[in-house]
A protein has these predicted regions:
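N-terminal positive-inside, membrane-proximal cytosolic segments immediately preceding the first
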Residues: 1-28, 52
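Short solvent-exposed coil/turn linkers within tandem alpha-helical repeat scaffolds
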Residues: 82-89, 103, 117-126, 153-161, ...
Length: 209
């Protein structure tokens, strides 16, 4: 009888505890499950969006290669509308700038490069856009603006040689060959792109005095 009463007391204690705490326990479990499944849904959504952006960018690249600027602009606009803040958005703006330059629309290209710089989620992509924008500014004769942009964006080790090459071009355009030589030499040492072209520029500089 004692054992029965003890078991009965245990059952009653459990019932009482559940009556007081059952709702909060169920609520906590529900919240926990919601958090787990909500996180999974969010991850799945992000992966799906990334796949859509990747496919849209591949289509944009293919269209650009066909030489149809209007179609490229349309596809770029659609991609940017949905994925403008992603890396694919920055890449789309870089492609759009190329389209506009080929179409002899430097102002439109400039706008695309500025957008790529402003919204690129990766500093490396932003610097690629900055390099192209600096070259565009120099081609338009905006040397001071190009110099300011280079000074702002030449941070860290990435693309340091390419920024040095642009500083050499600026110095050469300003009639400072010694400064240009030093910048070109630095660019070559840092592994800038088109090192052979930079070496030709160095060889064609007037001899140091």
């Amino acid at each position: 009888m004692n054992a029965y009463e003890t078991d009965e007391e245990k059952v009653e204690a459990i019932k009482g505890w559940w009556k007081e705490n059952g709702i909060s326990v169920v609520g906590g479990l529900a919240l926990g499950l919601a958090a787990v499944f909500g996180w999974r849904a969010w991850v799945d959504h992000q992966e799906d969006m990334a796949q859509q952006a990747s496919s849209a960018f591949e289509q944009l690249v293919a269209t650009v290669e066909t030489g149809n600027p209007e179609a490229a602009r349309t596809q770029a606009a659609l991609l940017l509308e949905k994925h403008g803040d992603s890396a694919y958005g920055a890449l789309a703006n870089l492609m759009l700038a190329r389209v506009e330059m080929d179409a002899k629309q430097p102002e439109a290209a400039r706008k695309a490069l500025e957008q790529a710089m402003a919204k690129a989620p990766d500093p490396g992509l932003a610097r690629v856009a900055a390099l192209r924008l600096a070259r565009l500014l120099m081609a338009q004769g905006e040397m001071d603006a190009a110099a300011t942009l280079i000074a702002q964006q030449d941070k860290g080790e990435a693309f340091k040689g390419d920024f040095a090459a642009l500083r050499g071009d600026l110095a050469l355009a300003a009639g400072r060959p010694a400064e240009a030589r030093a910048a070109y030499d630095q660019a070559i040492a840092l592994g800038a792109a088109n090192a052979a072209l930079l070496q030709l520029k160095v060889e064609n500089l007037p001899p140091a005095t």
